[in-house]
Amino acid sequence: MPRRQEVLTWEDVNALMDHLLPQMQGAFDALLMITRGGIIPGGMIAEAMDITYILTAAVRFSTELTDKRLAWPTFLQFPEDSLLKDRRVLIVDDIWGSGRTITTVIGRVEACGARVETAVLHYKPGSSLFKQSGPTYYAAITDALIVYPWETGRGMQGVPLPGLTPI
């Protein structure tokens, strides 16, 4: 059975932000965006909440293993420990699917001595490898393949884009 797919517009993303932002209370000392999916939602949250201390993390998992749960993460980019220590840090990604990436980042940020909270646009509890945990804040629960407006190529085979005609 083919997986359900949702192609979102910028209006959809704005509506998700309208649901997500009121959940977060108090000031954050830092915002850590997970590349690539967390860059745009992270920027939107930082702007809306006036967070100016913005960091990025990039994590890669080996694709060579057949059991993806056994893949060991490689940090391609991560802030120095001193930039996180004793701070309230909001970690942002677009989606919590398997949870591998964001959970890996959570562990490393906590090891630096930070207080961590997480925010995603979409949470997929049915796909999560971490059944006892999930994001602190999320805008929607889904089981669909989500295609965000900034992902013009991913998952779009055969899907017409609104307002565009083929050349």
Question: Can you say where each PLM-predicted feature lies in the sequence?
Answer:
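PRPP-associated nucleotide enzymes
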Residues: 1-167
